[in-house]
From Swiss-Prot:
Catalytic residues as annotated in Swiss-Prot or TrEMBL: C76, C226
Pathway the protein contributes to: Amino-acid biosynthesis; L-lysine biosynthesis via DAP pathway; DL-2,6-diaminopimelate from LL-2,6-diaminopimelate: step 1/1
Protein's UniProt keywords contain Amino-acid biosynthesis: yes
Highest taxon listed in the record's lineage: Bacteria
Principal localisation: cytoplasm
InterPro entries cross-referenced by the UniProt entry: DAP_epimerase_AS, DAP_epimerase_DapF
Keyword field: Amino-acid biosynthesis, Cytoplasm, Isomerase, Lysine biosynthesis
EC numbers for this chain: 5.1.1.7
Any one GO BP annotation for this protein: lysine biosynthetic process via diaminopimelate
Family: Belongs to the diaminopimelate epimerase family.
Gene name of the record: dapF
Site (Could be important to modulate the pK values of the two catalytic cysteine residues): H168, E217
Gene source species: Desulforapulum autotrophicum (strain ATCC 43914 / DSM 3382 / VKM B-1955 / HRM2) (Desulfobacterium autotrophicum)
Protein name: Diaminopimelate epimerase
The protein's assembly and partners: Homodimer.
Length: 283
């Protein structure tokens, strides 16, 4: 079987996009197996994940994502911007604001057009942050895991746990460049206090409107950007009294603008998505 695919990236977080609205792909090969093959940067297309366009009975379109190790996360913010741009430009949806079914619930992206009606950016309503430990999930006796101390490799690390439909452990440090991300990130990702594992963000606060972060993604390792992670970081920073409700988050792949609307309690993330190339691959 040969598959048509589109390679997309959002701030360097890259994905292999597939249209399986007719179900032909999943009938041929399981998505986790396909993810392992296509995400290989030596033997496949290469990517931080595969994203599948599927039909939905509850939203305008359905979204599924699989990590390079075959695991299925609930959602991906950068992937959602790529997804939204692709389905809009391909005419799968025609509205600039539409609904997407994900494992994290219904997500609402909005396409922002230039004067020439080109896709300039995508603003994604990420929904409400989840702060109750049992829903993140994170093993904790408090109502919120804010500045919670845990033991990691014999050291005490202060984390704030947030879910944006997927779990995040946010750690504030003096200089993110000096962090041994692979060792610490992997240890926290698989920490026993996170029964579903977790994404890990190390953050340096520049001022009350700017943050710098590095991310270790659950099932993918270090990536250049993470949209749900940037959203979780703003929530964690705000809960710790470090930032305002709107901030610019600097990631290795570029910048995201994050706004936490206090009236609706929703997070809004705005950033770019780029078409890299299209192709066909035999599986």
């Amino acid at each position: 079987m040969e598959l048509n695919f589109t390679k997309m990236e959002g701030l360097g977080n890259d994905f292999v996009m597939l249209d399986d609205r007719n179900g032909a792909i999943v009938q041929t090969v399981p998505y986790p197996v396909l993810a392992k093959k296509l995400c290989s940067r030596r033997f496949g297309v290469g990517g931080d994940g595969i994203i599948i366009i599927i039909d939905s009975e509850t939203a305008d379109v359905g979204f599924k994502i699989f990590n390079p190790d075959g695991s299925e996360p609930e959602m991906c913010g950068n992937g959602m911007r790529c997804f939204a741009k692709l389905v809009f430009e391909q005419g799968i949806v025609t509205k600039q604001r539409f609904t997407v079914e994900t494992l994290a619930g219904t997500i609402i992206p909005e396409i922002l057009l230039s004067d020439t009606r080109q896709v300039e950016a995508i603003c994604v309503d990420m929904g409400e942050p989840i702060l109750e430990p049992d829903r993140i999930p994170f093993k904790c006796n408090r109502q919120r895991a804010v500045n919670e101390q845990i033991q990691v490799k014999g050291e005490t690390v202060s984390i704030t746990a947030v879910s944006m439909g997927n779990p995040h452990a946010v750690i504030f440090v003096d200089d993110v460049k000096k962090i041994d991300l692979e060792n610490l990130g992997r240890a926290i990702e698989t920490h026993e206090l996170f029964p579903a594992k977790t994404n890990v963000e190390f953050v340096t606060v520049l001022n009350d409107q700017e943050l710098v972060m590095r991310v270790w993604e659950r099932g993918a390792g270090e990536t250049l950007a993470c949209g749900t992670g940037a959203s979780a970081v703003l929530v964690a920073a705000s809960l710790n009294g470090l930032t305002r409700e709107t901030a610019l988050v600097h990631l290795a792949g570029g910048d995201l603008s994050i706004h936490w609307d206090q009236q609706s309690n929703h997070l809004f993330k705005t950033g770019p998505a780029t078409h890299v190339f299209t192709g066909r691959i035999k599986i």
